[in-house]
């Protein structure tokens, strides 16, 4: 009987650790971004303006993205999630978001996706960003990187 008690005490920390890892893997992680004008030259000043914010919540491999924008000089057309090779550099589109216009200059964006393991890693490393396009700026009007936020306990 005494042997079983020692065996149980030896495996108790392992059981606790496995349970803790399983619980922490499902804790939501929050990412936020500030939408600001894409890099522009003098000729683009008449067409590119605005600001906004975006939040992404990752639970397991599912991400839910929501955001708002305003101050555009023409109506929004599309919003996309792009993957950048490094933060601050444009990259290819990987996901399409829904855009709802409140009026000609403002609106919301949203989407919910099941990410691949590579996309989750890219999100956690700050390689994913949102790009919002508009009628007068079809190559992008606003953009913002999704950066991890610390969970306050």
Residue ranges of model-derived segments:
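Bacterial N-terminal signal peptides
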Residues: 9-19
